[in-house]
Curated annotation (Swiss-Prot):
One of its GO terms (cellular component) is extracellular region. The modification Threonine amide is found at residue 11. This is Periviscerokinin-1. One of its GO terms (biological process) is neuropeptide signaling pathway. Keywords: Amidation, Neuropeptide, Secreted. The keyword Secreted applies. It holds the Pfam family Periviscerokin. The keyword Nucleotide-binding does not apply. It comes from Bantua robusta (African bullet roach). Belongs to the periviscerokinin family. Disulfide bonds: none annotated. Expressed in abdominal perisympathetic organs and abdominal ganglia. It is found in: Secreted.
Length: 11
């Protein structure tokens, strides 16, 4: 996903 906290939810 994206960089940051969003990436944790969109691996």
């Amino acid at each position: 996903g994206s960089t940051g906290l969003i990436s944790f939810g969109r691996t």
